[in-house]
Regions:
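Helical (often loop-to-helix) elements that flank the catalytic cores of nucleotide-handling enzymes
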Residues: 104-119
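Conserved short beta-strand edge segments in small beta-sheet-based binding/regulatory domains
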Residues: 115-130
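Charge-rich, low-complexity segments
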Residues: 1-92, 101-107, 123
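Beta-strand-rich binding-surface signature
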Residues: 95
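Short beta-strand->loop micro-motif that forms the acidic, two-metal-ion catalytic signature
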Residues: 98
Length: 130
C-alpha cells in the first residue's frame, strides 16, 4: 500500500485576506486510527514563479506534481509509516501534509528528496496531532 492513497480525494478552495487557498484532501482520513499516526509533518515547497493568486503557473504545476510523486515513491520505497492526507497551495507555497507514526523513519527519505530538489526552497514543519 502506498503512503499516498490513490482514491477518495476531493478538493475545494476558499479565500482569505492573503489570497486564495486550494485544498486537496483524502476523504477517508476520518476512518484512520489517529493513534497509529500521532504526528503531523508538512513538507513545504516555495514556488519559483507563483501566479497573481499564489498558485503555480502551468509549467511549474507539472514540476510540483513530479516532485510529489518522487517524494511518495521514496517514502514507499523505505516503507515509511506515514500517510499523505492533504495538499494545500496558497501564497506561493505548496504544502504536502503527512500523518506520521514516527519521525525517525520519515526524515531520511524526506532529506534525500530535499537534496534531489535543491533548486527549490523546501522545508518541513513537524508537530503533534492531526
Amino acid at each position: 500500500m502506498s503512503v499516498c492513497p490513490e482514491n477518495d480525494w476531493e478538493s475545494y478552495s476558499y479565500s482569505t485576506d492573503n489570497g486564495p487557498v486550494i485544498v486537496g484532501f483524502h476523504t477517508k482520513s476520518n476512518t484512520i486510527n489517529q493513534n497509529e499516526y500521532p504526528y503531523c509533518a508538512r513538507v513545504l515547497i516555495t514556488l519559483k514563479k507563483p501566479n497573481v493568486h499564489g498558485g503555480p503557473l502551468q509549467d511549474e504545476a507539472q514540476v510540483l506534481w513530479d516532485m510529489e510523486d518522487r517524494l511518495v515513491a521514496l517514502l514507499d520505497e523505505h516503507k515509511t509509516p506515514c500517510l499523505m492526507l492533504g495538499r494545500l497551495t496558497h501564497g506561493g507555497t505548496r504544502e504536502l501534509v503527512f500523518q506520521v507514526a514516527d519521525y525517525g523513519p520519515f526524515r531520511p527519505p524526506v532529506g534525500r528528496w530535499m537534496g534531489e530538489h535543491g533548486d527549490y526552497e523546501t522545508d518541513v514543519s513537524e508537530h503533534d496531532g492531526w
